[in-house]
Design a protein with these regions (language model features):
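Perimembrane helix-loop junctions in membrane proteins
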Residues: 31-45, 85-98, 120-127, 154-165
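Membrane-interface helix-boundary signature
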Residues: 6-16, 20, 60-70, 92-102, ...
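Interfacial non-cytosolic loop connecting adjacent transmembrane helices
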Residues: 41-69, 116-142
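Generic alpha-helical transmembrane segments
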Residues: 68-84, 109, 144-148
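Cytosolic juxtamembrane helix and N-cap/initiation of the first transmembrane helix
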Residues: 1-41, 157-165
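Alpha-helical membrane-associated segments of multi-pass integral membrane proteins
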Residues: 14, 24, 112-160
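Short amphipathic alpha-helical segments that mediate assembly, nucleic-acid/protein binding
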Residues: 3-6, 55, 79, 101, ...
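Loop-to-transmembrane helix junctions at the membrane interface
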Residues: 80-113, 117
Length: 165
């Protein structure tokens, strides 16, 4: 009975790994496509007509070395996680338990992103929306929590498979 349960848990871990792999690949693709704009932000997009008095502050934030470094590091970490997820998928496909490292690294990077955005995103008011930045932060945190679920489920099922060994 335990062997059947273990196989079932590994199959579930494999499925959640695949979901995370697809999400990570899509995220990496959008990060790479957007990297040019992050490394060389177009000042003409940051107009006072759209962003009000916060336009200059937003451009300076977008053009800061911290924002650029964070974007490049994010692409590198995403590539690393994607490679690790592919390796984990191969092992799980064979019914072999895999390390939880890519899932923990994914969660670490999600939390780092949330902290970074909370600390360094300027508070802005856009055409009367005083809580605009707060609203975007809440939506962003919610989306990041959703994207974290496959990693969390993978970890849970890998632990369950270990206990069935």
């Amino acid at each position: 009975m335990k062997t059947k349960d273990k196989k079932n848990y590994l199959k579930k871990a494999k499925n959640w790994n695949m979901v995370l792999l697809v999400l990570k690949a899509l995220g990496l693709l959008t990060s790479i496509v957007g990297l040019r704009g992050v490394l060389n932000p177009d000042k003409s997009l940051y107009t006072e007509a759209v962003y009000g008095s916060s336009a200059t502050q937003l451009y300076e934030q977008a053009n800061s070395i911290g924002t650029k470094a964070y974007a490049v590091i994010g692409v590198i970490i995403s590539i690393t996680i994607l490679i690790m997820l592919i390796s984990a998928h191969k092992k799980l496909k064979e019914g072999v338990p895999t390390a939880k490292t890519p899932y923990y690294l994914h969660l670490f990077w999600i939390v780092t992103g949330i902290i970074y955005s909370l600390l360094f995103t300027p508070k802005i008011e856009i055409q009367g929306f005083t809580e605009f930045a707060s609203m975007i932060s809440i939506v962003s945190i919610g989306l990041q929590a959703l994207v974290s679920l496959p990693a969390i489920f993978s970890i849970i099922y890998l632990f369950k498979a270990e206990t069935e060994a």
